[in-house]
Amino acid sequence: MRKCLKLISLAAAFTLLFAACGAADPPASGAQTPAQTGGAMQASDVQIALIAHSPESILDDQSFNQGAWDGIQRFLANNGLPLGRGGNAEFFQPHEGSDAARIDLINDAITAGANILVLPGFNFEEALYEIIEDSLFPDVKFVLLDASPRRDGNTRMADNVAAVHYAEEQSGFLAGYAAVMEGHRGLGFMGGIAVPAVVRFGHGFIQGAEHAAASLGLAAGEVTINYTYLGQFNPDPAFATQAAAWFHGGIDVIFAAAGGAGGSVFAGAETAGGLAIGVDVDQGHLSETIITSAIKALDVSVYDIINDFMNDNFRSGELRFDARNDGIGLAMASSRFQVFTQAQHDAIFDQIANGTIVVDATVSPMPSEANLNLSLVSLTEI
C-alpha cells in the first residue's frame, strides 16, 4: 500500500476476559443488544472478540492474528477506548483445533459480551457454515478473514457475515517484481499449505518476476524459481535446513508465505547468508535477512469493518481488498532494498491498481510455466 500504516503499540495484561473487566451480563433471550437496535452505536458498546483457530495459534504470531489485532487496537485507540486485552476487546483460544471447539469458543465469546467476532483464516470456513446453517447467533456480526463459510464446496452467506478476501496475487506480484528489479536472479517460494491465499501469493510472485525480467530485457532462464509447499504453518528445524540448502544451491532470496513456518525459513537465511521476503504483515523486524514483506492490509480491513459496524453500516457479503483500496502492498518503509526504489514501487503499484497490469488469480496448487504463460522465468517445482 502506498501510504504508511502506523501500527498501534499494544498494552495491558494478556489474561483478562470481557466478563472479568466489567462487561455487562449477557442479554436475556429476546432482549436487544446495541447491534440489534438500529442506528449508530456508542464506541463503548462495541465488544470485539478475536478467535484463534487452534491452541497453537497465538496472538503475537507476527503474522495473521497480529495483523487483525492491530486493526482492533486501531479502532480502540481512535475511539478513546483502553488498548490491549479486556475492556472492549479480547482474544480467545480453543482447547483443541476442531470445528466443535471453535463453535464452543465462539459461544463463550458471545456469552462474555462480544457482539462482533473476527475469525482469521480458512480454518473457520466449516464452523461458520454450521453456525449459519443452524441460524445460531443471528444478532452477532462475524468477520471471516481470508475465507468464506464453506462446506463440501458449497458456500453459504448471511446478513451478519462479512467474508473478507485479499488480492494476494497482487501483493505476491510486487514481491517477485521487486526481487528481480533489485538484481536477484535465483528466487524461491516456500508456502505453508496450498490453500487459495497461499497459492495466490506464490503465483503472483512468479508473475511479478516474469514481468520484471521482461522489463529488464533478461534472457530466458536467467531468472529461476524454486517452488514448494512445506505442508504446515508451524515452525520446524527441517524447514531451516531446506532453506539453507536452497541458498547454498544458488537461490538468493526466498519468499516465505508460511505463517509461523516462515520463522524457520528466516533462520535458514541467517545460517546460509541468504535473504527472505516476509508475508501478511511487515515482518522486517524479525530478521535482518528480510528485505521486504508482501502485505495484505489485515489491520485496515478489520478496522474499517468494525468502524462501519459501530456506525450501523456493517458490510455483509464477500468483500475484496486489493490495490484499488490499499488492501495489499509491499513493506517499503522498512525494506532493505539497495536498488529497488519507492518510485519504482509506486509506478508498478499504480499499474496494478488502475488495471493496466492484471495479475492472474487462478488457483491451481502447483504452478507451471504453461498455465502462467512464462517465457523468461524457469520454474522448478520441488
PLM feature spans:
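Acidic, polar-rich N-terminal leader regions of halophilic archaeal proteins
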Residues: R2, C21, A35-Q36
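Bacterial N-terminal signal peptides that target proteins for export
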Residues: M1-I8
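Hydrophobic helical h-region of N-terminal Sec-dependent signal peptides
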Residues: L10-F14
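C-terminal motif of bacterial Sec signal peptides marking the signal peptidase cleavage site
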Residues: T15-A20
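A residue-level marker of the well-folded mature domains of exported/periplasmic proteins
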Residues: D25-I382
